[in-house]
Amino acid sequence: ANHSLYGLGECAPLHDLSPEYDAHYETFLHAVSRRVEQSRRLDREALRNHPSVLFGFETAFLSARASLRGESHLTLLPTPFSLGQTGIPINGLVWMGTYEEMRCRMQEKLREGFRCIKIKIGAIDFNEEIRLLRLLRQDFSPADLQLRVDANGAFSPEEAPARLRELSAFGIHSIEQPIRPRQWDAMARLCRESPIPIALDEELIGVNHPREKERLLRELRPQYLVLKPTLHGGMAGTEEWMRLSARHGIPYWVTSALESNVGLNAVAQLTAYAAEKIWRENAPENVAHLPATHGLGTGQLYLKNYTATRLVIKSGVLHDLTL
């Protein structure tokens, strides 16, 4: 093999979330590999409905292109971030637990330098979650800590308005996906009336064509998008979301989806590139800046990981020290 053509990518579908992930996934992956070898090109249009496959091949192509330039195969999109000159602020993640467990985790995240925490809600009794949030806000004010919550579609359309009103007492920055996807009338109403800004996440899965994306943004008008390349169209599909959201004045942040350091490296570099180029070139001048904090800390969950990348978190900021 010619080492100069070396490229590294990652396909990391998620069970129950990636619509293309089924018993035939690996067979399809091998078929795409053969087509790419024969044609020596990547047919992105043919892979629109297979975002994790598209993401893997896109990152491998970008990696090979970097190798051909004589650069590290990990420098996919040259930016100040990928050159180690700047970092990307990221949120910490705290799961629901007892008050003592959550307070200890919050204190640990603050000591580590995080100033934005995402809390998963909807897994335990809602009244208990409210009690825990009330206690936590007594310890950590909005000036100390930005709180984002992620409901993962836990609320019904009927109960969601009242629950959002209760949550709004705690200075919540935003709530991700309060109700399950594909309930557009209810979601549009929540986006109009919720006292907490709404960020769409699972709602974007399976919405892969530009016309569909345009319609979703026009009809739902969310306050934010949460973009995950493995789930939301690969690199190219995510860039489409970014351009459209910028034109609609809807800020986004980018989140990894349990990829290893190979995928996380690509997602982080896309995040930095998009902030430099895509948002700046497409957003109206009167639209707010992108949220500074992204969700790129999931590599910490691995016991063993790809070690050639040197993605390091310092004081709540992700740095690329690979070079």
What are these model-predicted stretches?
Residues 257-323:
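Flexible C-terminal active-site loop/helix
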Residues 95, 117-126, 148-153, 170-183, ...:
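Catalytic beta/alpha-barrel core
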